[in-house]
Amino acid sequence: MSGHSKFANIKHKKAANDAAKGKIFTRLGREIAVAVKEGGADPANNSKLKDIIAKAKSNNMPNDTIERSIKKAAGDLGAVNYEFVSYEGYGPKGSAIIVEALTDNKNRTASNIRNAFTKGNGSIGTQGCVSFMFDEKGFILVDKEEYEGDADELMMIALDAGAEDMSEEDDCFEIYTSPDDFSAVRENLENAGIPMAEAEVTMIPQTFVSLTDEIDIKNFQRTMDLLDDDDDVQNVYHNVEE
């Protein structure tokens, strides 16, 4: 699992950027809508919705906004039907990029994402062309400033909760689970009073690519900026070391 802290930093930067643009709540609202459509409006019987609600709260989404999103999706009152789509492609130096989106217009989304790759001198590939370079894992981040215990104590709690592994970084602890066990582990940690700064099922790069050429760096950032600006895009995973 070494090297994942770089990925966590990438995700933190994206989250901070989204919050500054006022887009993070829109993206979370779409995730809530899809979860409700798939499994119902009761988080007690819908683990996916329960996980997204926890994620929304960790991003400071107001409770009334969360409730409105759930009721809107459950009642079909003006609700938009979003469809999950994913794209895989290449950035500079063969770097791997995975884009996940929720959209009500697949043609629009495909065009925008293709443009983002092209503007950065990259290209969209076929499904599966880069996903084999990533591992799907549950990822839980515990900020050392928020957690008062020590590493050994947290390791015991995490493993007892069903986690696969844990690593310690300079300012945080990173806990990993299988995708199937993520919901149970997150809930067990929550019940144990463990503060979680981040908790989600994500794609972790097996190896990283380093960009040293200034043009490559600018092209890659151009693609990332365009994807960040797209309201349809929910998640972007890549293996570029920043």
Describe each region flagged by the PLM.
Residues 139-242:
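Positively charged, low-complexity, intrinsically disordered RNA-binding extensions
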